[in-house]
């Protein structure tokens, strides 16, 4: 007997009968095939050995970290001062039609003498590059600063014939203070400066200019965790001396012949609590008169001068 679908006047609904079987084109078969040899453990991202290898690669890459972006110095006075101070630069931009004066002429001449690219650009292009800041028709491109690694800084300081002398900065946000401290470190025989990676001044063109060229020969390192770095330096035999107005002793009692790292806090905030706890001693600078505190860079210079004096007399 025929089914209902064969009845006269019956309507066959779509999809009630299976259509022809269609193959997968080999997709299912290929999915069952092998995927090749299993990679070594250190190449597998989720394997413990792979995670250790990735961490080691990141640490190696970070030994000479640079800042994130290049810097653009704007204006005739800042540009000529940077070039006079030997701030490293990659390009000098001059807007077409800019009236030349002594500063612009000197900037172009110094850039040419140092092999810095000199590029003439449309004024609107320079406006865009300067984010509409006041550029006076001239701008200098400064590359990111190449920071040392704290481990390398410690190794180089300990390999020197003189006892290690380093400075660490805590809560220092003014690049001019940083530049002045770098200058003092170079002047008094120090081996370098350590900065925290966050909430700290960076080696910008302003800091470089304030250092009067000392930034070219005095390494600056960035520490991911300043407290951990201070502990590491203490374990390596350095005395950690914190400088604070409320110190327990004065700088006269520092043993300057011992390998030392001086930790300098800001004039306003001083040293943070954890940093104070990681210092072997907290010292202050004796002062006459009502002056309560010194600028951070001045205070650092006074302590470094005292340590240098002791070492000269030894």
From Swiss-Prot:
InterPro entries, per database record: Alpha/beta_knot_MTases, Ribosomal_eL30-like_sf, rRNA_MeTrfase_TrmH, SpoU_MeTrfase, SpoU_subst-bd, tRNA_m1G_MTases_N
SUPFAM superfamilies referenced in this protein's UniProt entry, alphabetically: alpha/beta knot, L30e-like
EC number(s) stated in the UniProt entry for this protein: 2.1.1.-
Biased composition (Basic residues): 44-65
Gene3D superfamilies in UniProt: 3.30.1330.30, 3.40.1280.10
Any one GO cellular component localisation term in the record: cytosol
SMART domains referenced in this protein's UniProt entry, alphabetically: SpoU_sub_bind (SM00967)
Pfam family, one: SpoU_methylase
GO terms of molecular function: RNA binding; RNA methyltransferase activity
Region (Disordered): 1-70
Keywords: Methyltransferase, S-adenosyl-L-methionine, Transferase
Enzyme class per UniProt: transferase
Domain of life: Bacteria
Gene Ontology terms describing biological process: methylation; RNA processing
Residues that coordinate or bind S-adenosyl-L-methionine: 265, 285, 294
Family: Belongs to the class IV-like SAM-binding methyltransferase superfamily. RNA methyltransferase TrmH family.
Name of the molecule in the record: Uncharacterized tRNA/rRNA methyltransferase Mflv_1447
Organism per entry: Mycolicibacterium gilvum (strain PYR-GCK) (Mycobacterium gilvum (strain PYR-GCK))
